[in-house]
């Protein structure tokens, strides 16, 4: 069956339908990863987005039980050049097509993803829709241009109830803004006792859990939409060590007076080179974000620790006076290189230092 991809600017791409037989709309973005499609599709940071994979062949090792970043993916669609109808991998349980059908996510293949990516790079991310052949392009485009993207993504993906992942090590409260399971795995490997709490949890509720440290997770959307989270961070910093990742990084920076802005097309993939400004060390990182921390009017209480090599985006900050730091990239690296997984050890060491001084 033929399927059409329509962009807000009027661009139309025709391809073959695969995945779920439904129509959809959302913000279209692109990811430059060669592999890791399962982790990307199940990453809640893609909530409400149609993912374009720039690598030409996707799905060649199928879907397996180990690489989920969430059980219920909330991306809106998948755009690829070619999907592997007959994947081969000893871990696979189903094909990409079967997985998308199971999760109700439509896909389109046979698209010139290079041309599509050039449009997004030039004009920025925009609204898009997937419709089946036979429907009115004019009507679909008119409805798309009138539509409004929702800004309550974190409300959709954050846990509604607190839950624990038992361990014998540090007591960590993990604030869920759209948590990736790989963050849980990294903390569990360090024997942490983890309590995952909703994004609406107050500072006092966190303090009542007597945590050794607080981790602010990744998540979708605009940090401007979370004033309560900013207040929570302001009230706990200095009392408990803090580590922020992705959305958690943006919220931590904003809570200390930094500004954030929407990027033209964002960073999505796991080949982004980041420089540690103090040591000069360059790491390749996994990233998925459409907003970033601005250097403009940068607050006195923070200093920049990392920057992206190509566009100088702020990739990490640290507090001058409190035991707290954050990074824009994903040190859990799922998918992606493990160059920066040491930051979880740095978080644990920061907790030890804070407790010794206290």
Curated annotation (Swiss-Prot):
Domain of life where this protein originates: Bacteria
Pathway given in the UniProt record: Amino-acid biosynthesis; L-arginine biosynthesis; carbamoyl phosphate from bicarbonate: step 1/1; Pyrimidine metabolism; UMP biosynthesis via de novo pathway; (S)-dihydroorotate from bicarbonate: step 1/3
Gene3D superfamilies referenced in this protein's UniProt entry, alphabetically: 3.40.50.880, Carbamoyl-phosphate synthase small subunit, N-terminal domain
GO molecular function: ATP binding; carbamoyl-phosphate synthase (glutamine-hydrolyzing) activity; glutaminase activity
Catalytic reaction(s) noted: hydrogencarbonate + L-glutamine + 2 ATP + H2O = carbamoyl phosphate + L-glutamate + 2 ADP + phosphate + 2 H(+)
Residues annotated as domain Glutamine amidotransferase type-1: 171-357
Active site: 246 (nucleophile), 330, 332
Pfam families to which the protein is assigned, alphabetical: CPSase_sm_chain, GATase
Enzyme Commission (EC) number: 6.3.5.5
Enzyme kind, highest EC tier: ligase
Keyword Nucleotide-binding: yes
Region (CPSase): 1-168
GO biological process: 'de novo' pyrimidine nucleobase biosynthetic process; 'de novo' UMP biosynthetic process; glutamine metabolic process; L-arginine biosynthetic process
Keywords: Amino-acid biosynthesis, Arginine biosynthesis, ATP-binding, Glutamine amidotransferase, Ligase, Nucleotide-binding, Pyrimidine biosynthesis
Quaternary structure note: Composed of two chains; the small (or glutamine) chain promotes the hydrolysis of glutamine to ammonia, which is used by the large (or ammonia) chain to synthesize carbamoyl phosphate. Tetramer of heterodimers (alpha,beta)4.
Protein's job: Small subunit of the glutamine-dependent carbamoyl phosphate synthetase (CPSase). CPSase catalyzes the formation of carbamoyl phosphate from the ammonia moiety of glutamine, carbonate, and phosphate donated by ATP, constituting the first step of 2 biosynthetic pathways, one leading to arginine and/or urea and the other to pyrimidine nucleotides. The small subunit (glutamine amidotransferase) binds and cleaves glutamine to supply the large subunit with the substrate ammonia.
Similarity field: Belongs to the CarA family.
Name by which UniProt lists this protein: Carbamoyl phosphate synthase small chain
Upper taxonomic lineage: Bacteria, Bacillati, Bacillota, Bacilli, Lactobacillales
């Amino acid at each position: 069956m033929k399927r059409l991809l329509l962009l807000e600017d009027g661009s139309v791409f025709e391809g073959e339908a695969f995945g779920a037989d439904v129509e959809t709309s959302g913000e279209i973005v692109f990811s430059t990863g060669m592999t890791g499609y399962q982790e990307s599709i199940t990453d809640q940071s893609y909530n409400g987005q149609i993912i374009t994979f720039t690598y030409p062949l996707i799905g060649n090792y199928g879907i397996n039980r180990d690489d989920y970043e969430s059980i219920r993916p909330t991306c809106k669609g998948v755009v690829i050049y070619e999907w592997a109808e007959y994947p081969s991998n000893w871990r696979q349980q189903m094909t990409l097509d079967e997985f998308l059908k199971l999760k109700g996510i439509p896909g389109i293949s046979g698209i010139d993803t290079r041309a599509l990516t050039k449009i997004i790079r030039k004009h920025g991310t925009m609204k898009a829709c997937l419709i089946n052949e036979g429907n009115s392009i004019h009507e679909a485009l008119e409805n798309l241009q009138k539509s409004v993207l929702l800004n309550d993504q974190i409300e959709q993906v954050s846990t509604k109830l607190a839950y624990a992942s038992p361990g014998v090590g540090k007591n960590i409260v993990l604030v869920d803004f759209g948590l990736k399971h790989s963050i849980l795995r990294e903390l569990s490997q360090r024997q942490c006792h983890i309590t995952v709490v909703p994004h609406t949890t107050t500072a006092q509720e966190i303090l009542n859990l007597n945590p050794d440290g607080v981790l602010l997770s990744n998540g979708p959307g605009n940090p401007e939409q979370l004033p309560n989270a900013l207040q929570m961070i302001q009230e706990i910093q200095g009392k408990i060590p803090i580590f922020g990742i992705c959305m958690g990084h943006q919220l931590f920076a904003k809570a200390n007076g930094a500004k954030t802005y929407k990027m033209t097309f964002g960073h999505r993939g796991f080949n982004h080179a980041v420089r540690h400004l103090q040591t000069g060390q360059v790491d390749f990182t996994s990233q998925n974000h459409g907003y970033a921390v601005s250097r403009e009017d940068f607050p006195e209480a923070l200093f920049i620790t990392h920057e992206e090599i190509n566009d100088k985006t702020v990739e990490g900050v640290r507090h001058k006076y409190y035991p707290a730091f954050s990074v824009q990239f994903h040190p859990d690296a799922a998918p992606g290189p493990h160059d920066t997984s040491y930051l979880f050890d740095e978080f644990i060491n920061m907790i030890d230092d804070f407790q010794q001084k206290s």
